[in-house]
Amino acid sequence: MFNNKLSRRRFLGNFAFTSAAIATGSGSWVIRPDWANAAERLIKLGIATDLTGPLGYAGKADANVARMVVKEINDAGGLLGRPVELLIEDTASNESVAVGNVRKLIQREKVDMVLGGITSSMRNAIKDVIVARGKTLYIYPQLYEGKECTPYLFCTGPTPAQQCDEFIPWLIKNGGKRFALPSANYVWPHTLNVYARKVIESNGGEVIFEEYYPLDQIDFSSTVSRIISNKVDVVFNTVIPPGVGPFFKQLYEAGFLKNGGRLSCVYYDENTLNVNQANEIEGLASCLDYFKALTPEDPASAKIQAAYEKQFPGNFLFAAGSAATGTYRGLKLWEAAVKEAGKVDRDSVAAALDHAKIAEGPGGPAEMVPGKHHCKMKMYTAVAKGGNYDIVARSAGLVDPKEC
């Protein structure tokens, strides 16, 4: 059980865990089990994620997942017989703020591991503070563009190979060969599009145009006109919030879907379904490691989903594109590694994490590829229908990330 006393009250909408946390400063929370006492040597787990800013919906879900997993660990007696203390810092969708707050986790709190970061630009901003300067293990839970091979940094979200190799051929078969790549102007879209273009062209498709926009752009009238006038079949989107909602709405109003166009977006999940009216994204295709639609057929996924919804009812959903599944996977792999290592120092845990496996998780089992610092996992293609997703394709087994 968690301490319910607040030393300072700070409420962020319906951010579920704040009512059970000790707020230790602006954007800082500590969650400690009641059975922890001065005689116990705490294992300190740091979470650095966007609780505020445009990606706050994702960060709040990720922090809730961390709270759920740590509660399970502590209710079972902790790790190595020691309580796990959860320390959460707001990266605020702002890299300069994030660096300062992550530095607190490393220098002041001396955490044993940090998990977090949503965008790749955020990961790049905080990884040096954690790994190089802080000599601390770092787990990055979000789907991303690949090519992150920093020592002591482990990735537990999907890579371009996992999201594109089977998904793009499906799009060509179920959408068409003429692709547009409208994109936010930062590292993830730029690097992902290089990979996506190769897969499109090697499967007989064609990239009609590839464009990049400021992250805060909300007027896409010229882009929509270009899509319509060039008879684009498939929009392979990497525009992110706050721009993605207006973009999809403008595309819908221009008749793209009505005229047979296919929307696709590899980070779209149950959280982002709520960005637009259901009819504005009907038929949108996504490829992720988990969708809630899997729960009727997968008891392990159903159990995880139900536990999350019981503890955290509200608008911040357990969803893959928001890194909630990567957060769950990362924490369970870390737990397995600590148990194997029998200690929490960086080198020992990293050596065990390098080959860690979990038999059950959202979407299925997962395992680190030895020497590669990335996960094999199952992948699913789903299509938006009436405000939910239908699974339309799935990998035959665990998909190799093909990284490092």
Show where each model-derived region lies:
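Segments of small-molecule ligand-sensing domains
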Residues: K310-A324, L331-I391
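Flexible, small-residue-rich helix->loop connector segments that border functional cores
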Residues: V69-L79
